[in-house]
Amino acid sequence: MGSNLSPQLCLMPFILGLLSGGVTTTPWPLAQPQESCSLEGVEIKGGSFRLLQEGQALEYVCPSGFYPYPVQTRTCRSTGSWSTLKTQVQKTVRKAECRAIHCPRPHDFENGEYWPRSPYYNVSDEISFHCYDGYTLRGSANRTCQVNGRWSGQTAICDNGAGYCSNPGIPIGTRKVGSQYRLEDSVTYHCSRGLTLRGSQRRTCQEGGSWSGTEPSCQDSFMYDTPQEVAEAFLSSLTETIEGVDAEDGHGPGEQQKRKIVLDPSGSMNIYLVLDGSDSIGASNFTGAKKCLVNLIEKVASYGVKPRYGLVTYATHPKIWVKVSDPDSSNADWVTKQLNEINYEDHKLKSGTNTKKALQAVYSMMSWPDDIPPEGWNRTRHVIILMTDGLHNMGGDPITVIDEIRDLLYIGKDRKNPREDYLDVYVFGVGPLVNQVNINALASKKDNEQHVFKVKDMENLEDVFYQMIDESQSLSLCGMVWEHRKGTDYHKQPWQAKISVIRPSKGHESCMGAVVSEYFVLTAAHCFTVDDKEHSIKVSVGGEKRDLEIEVVLFHPNYNINGKKAAGIPEFYDYDVALIKLKNKLKYGQTIRPICLPCTEGTTRALRLPPTTTCQQQKEELLPAQDIKALFVSEEEKKLTRKEVYIKNGDKKGSCERDAQYAPGYDKVKDISEVVTPRFLCTGGVSPYADPNTCRGDSGGPLIVHKRSRFIQVGVISWGVVDVCKNQKRQKQVPAHARDFHINLFQVLPWLKEKLQDEDLGFL
């Protein structure tokens, strides 16, 4: 009955820009009706194959550490036969086989030696580099052959500093022509036959001592970027030091500063999302990419920034779904709604691949009416994410649009102030059919940065963007979770605390709580008695086995479970809240993070409300007078699961509260308001849906509203009408009057504000 409410998060906020370069890309032939191909004889020795594009292509799959030889993919030709198995030197092979992956040897290494020397290197082999006297080593002195056929670390370079520019090096597997590094000197790189060059083939020594373009590498068809490689390279590119920052930014030409992408809420950035919806992409990849973009928008918004969005899908023709000039283009919820409504079938009737027209659609959004630039145009960063396989088959070379864009934005015209940091593109190719030449041509090329990535499948793309999220600056943000499919229970509920109170000769009490700050856990007061000692209270967070030391338990002063015994009410749970103060400060991480509390600045940001938002306005947003979807976290079979419930805060509120009379000991209460005070929220019952109920061990845990990808606690689980978890098993069939009651945090805010005043929560 538990519900995983948060969508899979694929993407993090990152800067994406338009394309740069001038390389002619390779078109993909238009699809023609063709015969189906027989699968007889297509097997691969030591591996398997899977069909792609409804049987019109196949991919060979080998175990880890092996690659398909001589090709990774084959296509079904119009003659009804599969494409021939040919090696890199065009020799025909009769049968495909899985061969062990090797890493290439250095073709050349200048001004030094490497050891050991070998024609090739096996996975896990190491190689060491040493420089001659008078030369200094840059990069990695020791490198290891990895399972994907690439070397670990960075290119080793021996340099004596004699050139105007430093030696650009020879990446392993490439060949370099040119050994002079004076101003405006150039070097060129080449790959062996059958390998594809990624990065810049030609690099020129520029003013300031930097090289144009980006470091090249030689790629085999079976090579993919691992999620970790992509994440590290991407994050590195965002913070790379650059020169020639726009003087209007307060930095003179040649002055260095960190390349930081600033998502300014005032709207100094336009993010264009361009998604290939052609036949070669396929419906499943299109849907997966769309989900990733939805989560990108959500993630950017969760950090409190509001760039303007443009949204384009394309096949034979582009479709502009959102323009940056639309009034709501900076409204993340509205843009997400438009994206969710896009279907792969929207391009079904004309399903070619016209990347050039898609970029022209972006250009049209960037250009100005009557060619008159608006004020501040030169301070706006234009950004894009392009998800494609690079197989354009109509419309011409998309690179030709780039010159127009660069001219429009005055990019690269002033050598002292090239404004290159206002124009970037990161191209993500997904799957085995990606055209590496084309996606490389479409990506920006900047020194010490990587902008083009090839990942194995959509699942790997998810991994990429999870790993891109730099948690270090956001761990203290409340109500955020790591919703990765590989995440543990505490990645998905990082605020959840387990509480145990040991009472000699009386057994123990189990409860839940929520981390609300680095020193405090919020829970229910009834979990403790006045006789409990701090050393008998055990608290654990983040799934850790160690218990945290307790300094003190703070009860709400109005809590008194025996307060109405004289009136025949055996237990009275009004103000059933307590704060556990820890002796030592919690160290936030992916599995330990605070939940949001009402009427705090953090919740205002989480809900994307104006800074002037009042506590009452937060209450109206979180607890409107209606049925409110919420959740609590329960432990079942040692696993934390989310249970979706509805807070009855509208016309069902009265009937929900009246069912309290069915609770043991309350059957003789004449006025139910004697036990259900205004401090309670009510869940449970069968309308509008059959709500799951809490169990005894859930007491003290948070009642949560999940909104805009953030989790805000609105209540503390207190008591229930029916024990639905007898014999440690949750009953599936429960009576309609099975209700649960929770302390409404809006009703105990003065106490929370007083006790948490030193926790920097910014109470309103």
UniProtKB/Swiss-Prot annotation:
Residues 35-100, 101-160, 163-220 form the Sushi domain. The record marks R259, K260 as: Cleavage. It is found in: Secreted. It comes from the Eukaryota. Residues 477-757 form the Peptidase S1 domain. Belongs to the peptidase S1 family. Monomer. Interacts with complement C3b; this interaction is dependent on the presence of Mg(2+). This is Complement factor B. The lineage of its organism: Eukaryota, Metazoa, Chordata, Craniata, Vertebrata. The gene is CFB.
